[in-house]
Amino acid sequence: MKNLYATISSGKFKGKKLLLPSLQTTRSTKSIVKGSFFDSFRYELAGKVFIEAFGGSALMAAEALSNGATKAYAVEIDKNAYKIALQNAKLIGDELEIVSGDTFEMTPAIVARQNLPVILYLDPPFDIRDGFADVYEKCVNLARNLPKDKIYLIAFEHASHLNLPENIGAFTLLKSKKFGNTSLSYYS
């Protein structure tokens, strides 16, 4: 089977190719969605920790480091995707840490350890996949229980048909942008 790749599109690692895991088990962030996020928040990454929940290939975490984040994490439960993310991290450097495990268990612990403000990028598998019917509810509960003083921003990539609440715990919806079947909602 032919390898799939994505390219870092901006910053100091611009042009670097990263391996993608199987599209059977992961859903890579669309280029237009990735571009919109980094166009909006590129200059706010400095001095921040970026956590990519449901990390897949760790592309968003690598792009965040490329654009000035101090440290980045990608959390991935799928073993094959995790192995690919580890390979990609070797291309980026020690600032990109790949964590194997359940996002809902690992992310709060990673957030709690941080001394710098956190940008959390939630990119769960769309709920149309088997076994993921309650994934959005779990993501909302995860965000609701995070400490406000540690979180700078929560970006939530989701199916456009989903209407997220105006408030999730201490976090308020800043804006939402639609890209066909995918939307990005920002909370602070």
Locations of the language-model features?
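S-adenosyl-L-methionine
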Residues: 1-67, 78, 83-115
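Post-transcriptional modification and biogenesis factors for structured RNAs
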Residues: 17, 145, 188
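Short, glycine/acidic-enriched loop or turn micro-motifs at the edges of active sites
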Residues: 55, 79, 105, 126, ...
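A short helix-to-beta-strand connector/capping loop
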Residues: 70, 93-96, 169
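Conserved SAM-binding motif I beta-strand of class I
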Residues: 71-76
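S-adenosylmethionine
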Residues: 110, 114-172, 178-179
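Core SAM-dependent methyltransferase catalytic element
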Residues: 175-188
